[in-house]
């Protein structure tokens, strides 16, 4: 049955109780089922610039599932267990979604708004007891890397920092220029 009108909601709810439905119990299970049903359908798309002809990266459900599984396995390889926290301080990108999904499958995920100030980011890292942080590599016209580095100095619980480079989303000549003007800031922890 499809959902077309608000009254259809009751009909769908009356078909079976939520617990009696054959729904996946985990995020990984939900992604597995979706990729079985729609492997080649578009799942997510990202472009760094919003022009109609600007380069975009689109992932199918199969691609998203494979990359999410790879991210979850990477986090597990870094020692993340079910009760450990993976935090990310990232702008919107495909890597942000992969950090969210992979982190949630491997352990607990803590998204942190990159617009917060250093003290707020540090407080979230401490309060969540984040073990791993995924953040942006130094990039022109953004201070995410710098703020995260300063916050890490106030969050001794973090063991691993991973950096995402948005350079791959750029095309020439911007992709040639960014390495020359990239801020010289390295996250160390």
Question: For the regions a protein language model found, what residue spans apply to each?
Answer:
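Conserved S/T- and glycine-rich ATP-binding loop of Class I adenylate-forming
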Residues: 86, 103, 133
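Short hydrophobic alpha-helices that are characteristic scaffold elements of the AMP-binding
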Residues: 76, 100-107, 126-127
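Flexible, non-catalytic linker and terminal segments flanking ANL/adenylate-forming cores
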Residues: 1-28, 47, 165
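Short histidine/acidic/glycine/proline-rich micro-motifs that form metal-
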Residues: 17-18, 50, 138-141
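Conserved AMP-binding/adenylate-forming core of the ANL superfamily
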Residues: 43-93, 97-100, 117-122, 177
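Structural core segment of the AMP-binding/adenylate-forming
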Residues: 108-189
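A generic structural signal for well-ordered alpha-helical segments
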Residues: 34-35, 102-103, 125, 152
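AMP-dependent adenylate-forming
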Residues: 4-9, 30-60
